Amino acid sequence: MSNVYQLGLGDKKVSIRLPERAKARVLVPDYSPALVDVAAAVRKALTQPYGRPLDDLVRGLKRVLVIVPDRTRVAGLKEYLPVLTKFLADCGLGPEVVQILVANGMHQLAGREGLPEFLPRSVLDGLPVSEHDCHDKTAHFLAGKSSRGNSIYLNKKVAEAELVILTGSIGLHYFAGFRGGRKAVLPGVASFDTICTNHRLTLRSGEGFHPKCRNASLDGNPVNEEMLEVLRMIPPAFVLNTITDAAGKILRVFAGDSVKAHLAGCEALKRDVTVRVPAKADFVIVSCGGYPRDSTMVQSHKAIDNMAPILKDGSPMILLAENRHGMGSDELLGWFDEGGVAGIRRKLSSKYTFHGHTALSLSEKAARFKIYMVSSFEDDVVRRMGLTPAKTVEEAVTDVLSANAGDLTTYVFPEGSETLPVLEEEKGAAAS
């Protein structure tokens, strides 16, 4: 007797067959139903926001900047952005006033040919659109210095605006606590050095990662605190954030004050994605949730990070992650040649980069667990990261079951990048 499960891998669904002895339990977020009328929900959020309505804020303005997420984010952009831009047009703000800036952070630029993949055609044809390049020093201005000494360089278009509208989705983030809100600015439209200095706050000298720099953690999180500081350095900001399911369907919309609206969304998401488990697992199978959540290794490794607290040390994990856009950084793979966890940590303490951080996080998990990865990578690339390559899920499952006799406590996560599993006794501390 066996059970069959369907998990996402890129744009496809793959079947996984597990025997009864695996004692598999499927764990998914408890999302609210998808919105039937997204346009109506967005308009309501804009006119009844947390704080002043958007039509009141934009009255008489000559320069409005709309910051949107890049192609790595599932945000429902093609649904909500046309509603937002029409709302602005109805307020008398057209292409001579409104422009779009893609918040790439340190991610790869999409290029003109890649923009239609995630931006609606009506916006591309109707408004000026540009991409933020964190490496283009001529495109940045000094907004100020944070209390921790970080020189905050941002895209000049922010300084030129009278109002900045921050859009995107709210989701878990493995060291900033949550995506959305303030992250559209830092790291979204910040310079490379500014981003690296902010992200370096995740490390404590000689002690590894800061304990507050983790999923669903905002209070006392130095990365988040500096991001909030930056909001006070820029023109007035209005947020439009969504919560989506793995298919990209919009479930909720939050708008208004850049702090209050985002916090309300974080609280709602936390309730949705936190799942209880009675004990640590002997075996975990996790999908990122398909494309674009498994678009690059930078994105895919977040699913591993989410699972680590509820898997027994030394136990197997199977990760389904297509990684069609590769590593997500030209430098990431080289970090795995630094001599394991200790070597990466040494180099990172003297020369911090975000991708070194990712390499350290992944290497720590690879040292604790046996992680199989089903992906589009060549086997040698997977092994270089300390992971075990598998051509198919069946191959990985067979290997795990043959190496582990008897019953197993198995958890299956179809939406691992957006699921926060916690042990039942730790449930109350999940959002501290």
Model regions and ranges:
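Histidine-anchored nucleotide/phosphate-binding helix
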Residues: R73-L93, S300-L311
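C-terminal catalytic subdomain
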Residues: D294-Y372
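N-terminal amphipathic/basic leader segments beginning at the initiator methionine
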Residues: M1-K44
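An acidic, phosphate/nucleotide-engaging active-site surface
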Residues: A110-F178
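Short internal beta-strands
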Residues: P95-G105, P316-A321, K370-S375
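Short glycine-rich or small-residue beta-strand-to-loop segments that form or flank ligand, phosphate
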Residues: R63-V74, Q99-G105, I285-S287
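Internal helix-turn-beta structural module
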Residues: G356-E418, E424-E426
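Membrane-embedded hairpin module used as a gating/binding unit in multi-pass transport
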Residues: F209-Y291
